[in-house]
């Protein structure tokens, strides 16, 4: 049985409708000092988020759990002596899920080896990741992948670590496109010289026991990003567990179909000095078979590797409300307005934490519909999670505690050893380029549509019929509001024909339905919450 058990589209089921809600966590040493204790406490944090994860009928098979850490250089130097690894940062590690078909695995490995050579990098070797399947659930065990790591050395001509990250990305994308065309299944959980992801169809308690690497004292990192997945209305699988390659995500992207279509439409217009002639090799940017979280990760990864700072890319994808905010600086408003013409917001209840291995950020959606709280300690640690209490901290060691506000960002720079505030990082991004000047010179706006005078109907019933009012609208909704001054109560069910199939006249609004995960989305009041609401699309 393959590790990927995702069903194909059939009947009323469509994979693109899937969303999930989860628990996220970050534990980091602000000065960038790596230790095994951070990994252990990250795993403990993950276990504390167990109640935010899901399980199937098999209680030992979770919806997914995992963690992202920095490349544990000392650990790999010890365990991969025969590979003669170069210094830290001069090699990348790919963590790969293969099917248990040995012939298929060898074929894919051979092709990856070929791509590494073609892209001018050095194949250092392969390693089978030791795992313990004894304590995982039956369903997880039946679909358990064969986990391997590939080690790739950087060409001597590459001195910029971002250029090396970009080359690893080019190798990965070509391998994925080749395998998809041949209907071969494999999955890179990560391929980077900075970070590595250990995850799977596991419960939080199983991650440490399943991946034996994590138990070694030489397995160190300056941060741990952890995630416990709850599949609200999705099918769990090994590759859909988090972390993704750049981010962890709690929530759902309600605008996914539009984001996906616009990204695909713009790909033919992409020009990149960073990628150069390699750009066609990495298309398409989004993995159409991925979840909403993985597609958001695909977009963030591409923009970062194309040269934008992680915070810049995050501000493009998940902007704070700007069109109705009178208190926003003109420079920041110009930044958001400029980028709104390039990229539609990936909107929906969202809390994400993201990293490129050097900077770690966290951001909330414009409505603040997902929780994210954090502590900063006097001994230079930060703890961020969906809730407090995930790691024990003595009260006297707490420097300060806070929560992320709607649309706001938190950024940690491990190289500078400090936390950068939302105001500072966004001011830096807004002043980096003359965005207002570019808007004045290049933005083409359409004149506003003037409202035409319509025929006046004095009769109330005629007006109500014209606008599609029904008996239920008047007597069940309006009358209670007028006579009793309270909102009427009603069920969510609606067994009337869809407007497009009805023989009766309908209100224009009845012809449109919003796609979203009903389970986890609270109602939005576009009038009272005008600041965070926009009709611009």
Predicted regions and their residues:
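Conserved short alpha-helical segments that host acidic/polar catalytic motifs at enzyme active sites
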Residues: 1-536
